[in-house]
């Protein structure tokens, strides 16, 4: 959960912490009878490793911003894609595109392609990981981007990575095909 909190937000009458409110919302959503999503969060991950069965506690990132509103971006996802996470600290002369194209085939089908690649560039290892996860909250607008053309280096990278990864032919569920990333 990514939360943007306006500096002028007032929490009058709140009886729970914001973490508790978010976790209660996640708990209620995962316990709905019509929920088809798998619960995949563990209590005591270093010990008994029992499933909480409601995907709490949620992983929450906060950002304080100007204004008087609160904005939530929630990814209802399991941990399988996290298991395929890769991180590297590249030298300035190394190619980001080459590293991604070399790395995607090593992930096998466990990330359930076709999918999205969250790529965080810059900062510390921790910052890059958060940037990568946050990038997955963006709209899938690659067709619009291709139509209008890239306007900066990040947009050029997005198109180049998509084209080269799809050219690998990994396809749906790793069984081959034209579309590996969206």
Specify the residue positions occupied by each region the protein language model found.
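Flexible, glycine/charged-enriched surface loops at secondary-structure junctions
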Residues: 31-45, 106-118, 143-153, 168-182
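Extended, composition-driven regions rather than compact fold-specific motifs
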Residues: 128, 163, 170-174
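A generic, well-ordered mixed alpha/beta core segment in the N-terminal half of proteins
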Residues: 2-68, 73-75
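Residue-identity detector for threonine
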Residues: 15, 50-52, 56, 103-106, ...
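Conserved mixed alpha/beta catalytic, RNA-binding, or beta-rich assembly cores of soluble enzyme
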Residues: 9, 16, 20, 26, ...
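Short, well-structured alpha-helical segments that form the helix of a local strand-helix-strand
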Residues: 22, 157-162, 166
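Short amphipathic alpha-helical surface micro-motifs
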Residues: 40-44, 52-58, 98-100, 163-168, ...
């Amino acid at each position: 959960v990514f939360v943007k909190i306006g500096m002028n937000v007032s929490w009058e009458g709140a009886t729970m912490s914001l973490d508790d409110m978010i976790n209660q919302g996640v708990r209620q959503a995962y316990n709905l009878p019509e929920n088809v999503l798998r619960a995949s969060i563990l209590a005591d991950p270093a010990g008994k490793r029992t499933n909480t069965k409601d995907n709490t506690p949620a992983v929450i990132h906060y950002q304080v911003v100007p204004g008087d509103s609160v904005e939530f971006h929630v990814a209802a996802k399991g941990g399988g894609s996290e298991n395929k996470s890769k991180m590297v600290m590249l030298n300035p002369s190394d190619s980001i595109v080459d590293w991604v194209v070399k790395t995607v085939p090593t992930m096998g089908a466990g990330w359930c392609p076709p999918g999205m690649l969250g790529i965080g560039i810059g900062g510390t290892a921790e910052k890059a990981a958060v940037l990568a996860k946050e990038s997955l909250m963006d709209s899938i607008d690659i067709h619009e981007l291709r139509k209008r053309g890239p306007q900066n280096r990040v947009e050029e990278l997005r198109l180049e990575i998509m084209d080269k990864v799809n050219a690998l032919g990994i396809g749906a569920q790793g069984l081959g095909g034209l579309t590996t990333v969206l």
